[in-house]
Amino acid sequence: MDRLPGFRDFYPEPLPHKDVWSADARCYIFDTWKKIAHRYGFREYDGPPLEPLELYTLKSGEEIVGQLYNFTDKGDRNVSMRPEMTPTLARMIAAHERNYRKPIKWFSIPQLFRYERQQKGRLREHFQLNADIFGEASSSADAEIICLLIDILRAFGLTSEDFVIRLSSRRAWSEFFSKRCPDPSKAYEFYQIVDKLEREDPDVSKQKLAALGFSYEEVTAFIASGEPTEELKAILDNLSARGFADFVKVDYGVIRGLAYYTGPVFEAFDRKGHFRAIAGGGRYDNLTNLISGGKFDPASNTVKGGKVDIPSLGFGMGDVVLTELLKERGLLPAFSPSADVCVLIEDLGR
């Protein structure tokens, strides 16, 4: 019997077939993730792989909702396998944030599930490092989370010649949209189009943008301008002071597809352009408010009325693209069976 499409078997080295994945490489990646996260003061958490369907339909966005592994369980509850970890974390924080000193810095390595078209760097399940900070609104937190991302990739042997962090602003895009379109309900659709500009046929993008009242030329001109906002300048100054200026550039071509982002957003790419994004994240300051009962207010483009309102940001780094990148660059160590203890037995009576 064959395994399901888009899922993986992990074998210890040596691998019996090219169509399976290395359990040893997975352990190496997980150990490196944990080591650097602990160095930055992050603590590990976990949550259930099955959640109420509403947790994802609430604010993740239509694209993810269309990729859910969801069903009605024996208790007649609508549930879903988790496609991402951030809503679970926001739910957990909203429930018990008073028990923890701020800022809260947590990480997790969940297995995630999305029913989507298989392609290079994308399967129907993957493991992902999630690192998040709750309770810190200043740009220093944005800089810290990006530094963590950079140092993790450096720990695998990658340098500024191998990858770059493309930094953008969902807030800047929100202002761009609101000045040209009076209907805030179309914002997420617009963000989805921009998110796919680099991967989609230009003629298709032009038609989609025109349907919303935008021209392809004005959108690409905004991307090309590359003028950092004040909040992006503060992040760049912080990263430069830490010696990480060579790893980051402002690029408004990044917008992030998920609906809940509110401020600075970023993605890590290999400079050769051989792979999809290695990692991505940003600010999602409204999510705990929304999950704790808040409602979106189109007039202010914010969420109001929730029981908990905590500034939040973080990123995710999947194991699929990272493993493929490390393989291509020859940065995965050799794995072979080894004994921790060698016992020699000698018969002294002979």
Task: Say what each PLM segment does.
Residues 167-206:
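Short terminal or interdomain "cap/linker" segment that borders an active site or interface and mediates
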Residues 16-20, 188, 208:
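Short, low-complexity, intrinsically disordered N-terminal segments
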Residues 41-46, 70, 189-192, 217, ...:
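Compositionally biased, intrinsically disordered low-complexity regions enriched in proline and serine
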Residues 61-66, 159, 177, 181:
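Short alpha-helix boundary/capping motifs
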Residues 23-40, 51-54, 76, 86-100, ...:
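Positively charged, Gly/Ser-enriched RNA/tRNA-binding surfaces
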Residues 1-87, 95, 143, 164-166:
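TRNA-binding/sensing appendages of the translation machinery
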